[in-house]
Each structure stands twice: as C-alpha cells, then as structure tokens.
Amino acid sequence: MVHLTKTLRFINNPGFRKFYYGLQGYNKYGLYYDDFYDYTDAAHLEAVRRLPPDLYDQHTYRLVRASQLEITKQFLPKEQWPSYEEDMDKGRFLTPYLDEVMKEKKEKEEWINFLSKD
C-alpha cells in the first residue's frame, strides 16, 4: 500500500506530468489533448457536434495540419508547439461538452429505469 501511495504521489507531481507530456509527442504536431477522441463513441461524436463553429474549425485545422505533417514526416517548428500550460488551458475544449453529454445520458438512463420499475 505504501508503494502504491508513493507511485500515485509521483504520477501526480507536476514535474512528472510535464515530462510525460513532452514524451507523448502530439504537441510536436500542434495538437491538443482533446483532439484525440474515440470516433466510434456516440458521446464523443455528440460532443464534437455541439462545439461552437470557431472551436470546431480550429479543431479541424489542427487535425488536417497534423495529418499533413505526418505524411511529409515533419514536425512543427518548436516555437509553434503548444506548451503544457497551454494544453491544460485551451487543450481541454471538448471536455465540458463531453461532460454535458454524459450527464444527459446518465439522466436519461435513470429516467428510463424509473419508468420501467412500475
């Protein structure tokens, strides 16, 4: 148990999080954390559908640019890489919409379960 506590404390360390963020490498393509989502999950698709047009366009632009960079085997210049702090601020653009969709889904399931008890 002590080992697990030390491990969790190490993982939650901001220095380790920044280090791991750099290892993941998606920032080299100019992508944010929420640019990766499960395209087969209905909740994620609904959250993307609810994005405001400007956020959706920015998301699409980042994906197209990253695809082009991957095809040409290049990375963005280091000045254009999103920092860890920027990713924590701007990079979680889909999370509020996804949380909203999940709450609606849970509420709908609870309502159906309530109605089916009778």
Swiss-Prot record:
It is a peripheral membrane protein. PANTHER family: CYTOCHROME B-C1 COMPLEX SUBUNIT 7, UBIQUINOL-CYTOCHROME C REDUCTASE COMPLEX 14 KD PROTEIN. Its main location: mitochondrion. GO terms for cellular component: matrix side of mitochondrial inner membrane; respiratory chain complex III. Residues 1-32 are annotated as: IgE-binding. Immunodominant epitope. Keywords: Allergen, Electron transport, Membrane, Mitochondrion, Mitochondrion inner membrane, Respiratory chain, Transport. Belongs to the UQCRB/QCR7 family. It is found in: Mitochondrion inner membrane. Gene3D superfamilies: Cytochrome b-c1 complex subunit 7. This is Cytochrome b-c1 complex subunit 7. It comes from Dermatophagoides farinae (American house dust mite). One of its GO terms (biological process) is mitochondrial electron transport, ubiquinol to cytochrome c. The lineage of its organism: Eukaryota, Metazoa, Ecdysozoa, Arthropoda, Chelicerata. Component of the ubiquinol-cytochrome c oxidoreductase, a multisubunit transmembrane complex that is part of the mitochondrial electron transport chain which drives oxidative phosphorylation. Component of the ubiquinol-cytochrome c oxidoreductase (cytochrome b-c1 complex, complex III, CIII), a multisubunit enzyme composed of 3 respiratory subunits cytochrome b, cytochrome c1 and Rieske protein, 2 core protein subunits, and additional low-molecular weight protein subunits. The complex exists as an obligatory dimer and forms supercomplexes (SCs) in the inner mitochondrial membrane with cytochrome c oxidase (complex IV, CIV). InterPro entries: QCR7, QCR7_sf.
